[in-house]
Design a protein with these regions (language model features):
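Domain-core and long-helix interface of multi-subunit machines
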Residues: 1-57, 112
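Amphipathic, interface-forming alpha-helical segments with heptad-repeat character
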Residues: 14-15, 21, 53-166
Length: 166
C-alpha cells in the first residue's frame, strides 16, 4: 500500500510494488501504473489505489435441493483485477481525498459481486438436483458451472475483474 506524505500545498505519493495507482483530475486519467511515485497539489485531483495481487475469497452458500433438503456448499474463488483503471472507475478504491475513519470498499464490493454470482449459479444447479445426486460426484459439474457463470458475467468483464480459480 502506498503512503501519502503531506507538505505545505503539496502531497508526495510513494506507491507500493503491489498496487496500481490511478490519478484522476477533471475526469481524466493523469497517471496510471504500478509503483508510481510523484508529487501532487492538494485538492486538485483524486487518487485510487487498486491491488494487483490475486485475492482468495471463500464463502458458504446454502440452497435447497429438489427434494427440499438443505445443502451447504463451501466455495473458494480466486480473482485478480486485470484492468485497474476500469476497476477504479466502477468500485471504491479511493485513496485521496478520504476521511481518516473511512476505508476504501472496492475489494468488499468485488467480494459481494462474486458471492452473488456464485450463489445464483449454485441455487439453480443444486436446486435441480436431488440430495443424493448433489452429494455424490457433482463437484466437477458444479465447479464447471461456476467457471462458466463467472466467464459469462458482463459486470465482471466490464469492471476489469478476472477469475483465476474456482
Amino acid at each position: 500500500m502506498g503512503t501519502l506524505h503531506n507538505h505545505p500545498f503539496f502531497i508526495r505519493y510513494q506507491g507500493g510494488a503491489g498496487d496500481h495507482v490511478v490519478q484522476i483530475s477533471a475526469g481524466r486519467t493523469i497517471r496510471s501504473g504500478v509503483g508510481q511515485s510523484f508529487w501532487l497539489r492538494k485538492g486538485r485531483c483524486a487518487l485510487a489505489e487498486v491491488p494487483t495481487a490475486n485475492r482468495a475469497h471463500s464463502f458458504l452458500v446454502q440452497v435447497a435441493s429438489s427434494d427440499q433438503q438443505n445443502v451447504n456448499a463451501q466455495v473458494a474463488v480466486t480473482y485478480c483485477i486485470e484492468n485497474a483503471e476500469a476497476a477504479a472507475a466502477h468500485y471504491d478504491f479511493g485513496l485521496y481525498p478520504r476521511e481518516a475513519k473511512k476505508d476504501a470498499q472496492g475489494l468488499w464490493q468485488i467480494d459481494e459481486t462474486v458471492t452473488r454470482i456464485a450463489h445464483s449459479a449454485l441455487a439453480s444447479t443444486i436446486g435441480a438436483m436431488a440430495l443424493s445426486e448433489a452429494i455424490s460426484g457433482a463437484l466437477e459439474r458444479v465447479s464447471g458451472l461456476l467457471t462458466q457463470a463467472f466467464a459469462e458475467n458482463e459486470q465482471l468483464q466490464a469492471t476489469g475483474v478476472g477469475i483465476v480459480d474456482v
